Amino acid sequence: MSTVFPVDSVGLVVPQTARFDEPLALACGRSLASYELVYETYGTLNASASNAVLICHALSGHHHAAGYHAATDRKPGWWDSCIGPGKPIDTNRFFVVSLNNLGGCNGSTGPSSVNPATGKPYGADFPVLTVEDWVHSQVRLGERLGIQQWAAVVGGSLGGMQALQWTISYPERVRHCVDIASAPKLSAQNIAFNEVARQAILTDPEFHGGSFQDQGVIPKRGLMLARMVGHITYLSDDSMGEKFGRELKSDKLNYDFHSVEFQVESYLRYQGEEFSGRFDANTYLLMTKALDYFDPAAAQGGDLAATLAHVTADYCIMSFTTDWRFSPARSREIVDALMAARKNVCYLEIDSPYGHDAFLIPTPRYMQGFSNYMNRIAI
């Protein structure tokens, strides 16, 4: 590996594409006749295929979880702090697979892909997806790679929901579930945040009912506002106060409604601008709906313990003290249900000032707890 990369990096990685021509039936009643999933792998699959770990991404995530696509990249993959030699998901031990989910906008088939039936981008005609749909598609990817059972399925936030769903839908295919900063279903407040974000996009004049690509435009304003709202919920009050306080961009107030006066305003606008230039509006709508619809215990009348009665995986559940988007109380709901179902579970509640985004930040106790659990997994 080139010396330009840190010694604990997986180094240069090349995305790969898997095409599936067998129709995929979806929860909404529709199906996809064919689709593609973009993914990356890190480490080496052992002879018995017993060391495979699946990484499931959150709302705005993608397949590029670790390493670099070029020596000139300024930043590595989004979870590089946790994936690599000697890191919690140690690529000296594990073969790691990270994908861009169906409906995404980073290469996998999604709303911005060409609909073979029309020759135009799917746009708003792309079917609504659920977490369970994603898991079904991920099963096929695993089989394509020769993996019948995952040593672990790992994810944070929406990724944690996928990890939990894996153990319910395919209990025989998962030995360990690492579910971080997640919840067994969304609260009314979380659904409300998602609806505000969707309305920002849907009411943008440039959205054109989801057919904005046909018009050669992007609903930039709506995406920007959606990201600004979402980003506030990913941070804690303390971390925002420490980072920005009431600091001004200049040394005076302008007494108008158009200037960017506070540092926190500047930060949110930057985050919104950056996001609106790289993310697809229809994908954002799909991802938030998948979050809203996630409720694996619904079929059991809301009884999560009964839903988990048949699972066989061991679980590691982690939460962060200042995460108010998916608070520790939501993780403890999962832990309590697993204990009621007499399943093996360990729980780590980590003191962190970083809010929901803490699952992306390599604080010492988080890294130690994560490593300790992963190192216990027999391969």
UniProtKB/Swiss-Prot annotation:
This protein's pathway: Amino-acid biosynthesis; L-methionine biosynthesis via de novo pathway; O-succinyl-L-homoserine from L-homoserine: step 1/1
Q: Which UniProt keywords apply?
A: Acyltransferase, Amino-acid biosynthesis, Cytoplasm, Methionine biosynthesis, Transferase
Entry's localization field: Cytoplasm
Catalytic activity, reaction form: L-homoserine + succinyl-CoA = O-succinyl-L-homoserine + CoA
Which residue range or ranges hold the AB hydrolase-1 domain?
Answer: 51-360
Give the positions the UniProt entry annotates as the active site: S157 (nucleophile), D323, H356
Q: Where is this site: Important for acyl-CoA specificity?
A: R325
Enzyme group, top EC level? transferase
Q: Name one GO cellular component term.
A: cytoplasm
Q: What is its EC number?
A: 2.3.1.46
SUPFAM superfamilies, per database record = alpha/beta-Hydrolases
Which Cys residues form disulphide pairs? none
Is Acyltransferase one of the keywords? yes
For this entry, list what GO says about its biological process: homoserine metabolic process; methionine biosynthetic process
Entry similarity comment = Belongs to the AB hydrolase superfamily. MetX family.
Protein purpose: Transfers a succinyl group from succinyl-CoA to L-homoserine, forming succinyl-L-homoserine.
Q: How does it assemble?
A: Homodimer.
The name this protein carries in UniProt is Homoserine O-succinyltransferase
The organism's lineage is: Bacteria, Pseudomonadati, Pseudomonadota, Gammaproteobacteria, Pseudomonadales
By which gene is this protein encoded?
metXS
